[in-house]
Amino acid sequence: VSRQIIGKYEAATRVPQRDKAAAMDEALATGDALTLLWEQIMDDAHVPPEFRNALMMERRSKHIREYHAILVPGLLQTPDYAITLVRARRVNGPPESIDQVVQTRVERLQKLSDMRPLLWFVVEWVALTRVVGDEKIMREQRRHLIDLMEGGTIQLQVIEDSRHNPGLCGAYRVMSLHDGRTVGFVEDPLGGRSVTKREEIDYLSTLFGMLQSEALSPRSTLERLKELDHA
């Protein structure tokens, strides 16, 4: 690879082929770091820009804590649940772009399986009961959550009584990374923003602990999900 081409790679004005990334890994003795980065960039090509950084941090996490007030968190969504939401928000998007966004969303959990981070979620009761799409989609979504909990993939807690809980805010997550850093991501109607200030991270972490204290235990949450499943 010429010096000029490498300069274009470094300036992000040209994307290398996968074999070039692998060759640079070998030349620089970087293991497969550049190849993995290439795969992440290509996988994320259809992800809205405001979510790309959060997605990269997600893949470097050893512990993810997430709260959602009205929806099932994206990491846990079934394809039908996800496509219903994406279609509702991307009304002007071509069908192929919607399919790509949905595929990226539902593959997120699978891409974390090798690293096995601790995944802990707190959601409001309405996230499990409000109908997204139709009743069949919701039954399949709740069954998916049951399978993830019984398989030990996630810990999930539900807040049944929302009158006095400290949440009632937008969705957010706190991610503890393998390099020792902790970062956050707060969602809003335009996408969201990353959080890196220590005092803001501390606030989000404390708030998550307060939400956990108001929620049912994971075991009780699983029992409530099964009751809904058989209702």
Pin down the residues of each PLM region:
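Basic, Lys/Arg-rich alpha-helical nucleic-acid-recognition elements, primarily the DNA-binding modules
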Residues: V1-M42
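Short alpha-helix boundary/capping motifs
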Residues: A23-D25, L34-L37, R52-N53, K62, ...
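Acidic-residue sensor for enzyme active/binding pockets
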Residues: E10, E58, E187
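Short, flexible segments with low predicted structural confidence
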Residues: I5-I6, H46-V47, M57, R116-P117
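Short, charged recognition helix plus adjacent turn
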Residues: T35-Y67, C169
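A short alpha-helix capping/helix-coil boundary motif
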Residues: V1-S2, E50-F51, V122-W125
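Short, leucine/isoleucine-rich alpha-helical interaction segments at C-terminal helix-coil junctions
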Residues: G31, L37, I41-D44, L211, ...
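Hydrophobic protein-protein interaction segments
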Residues: H63, Y67-A231
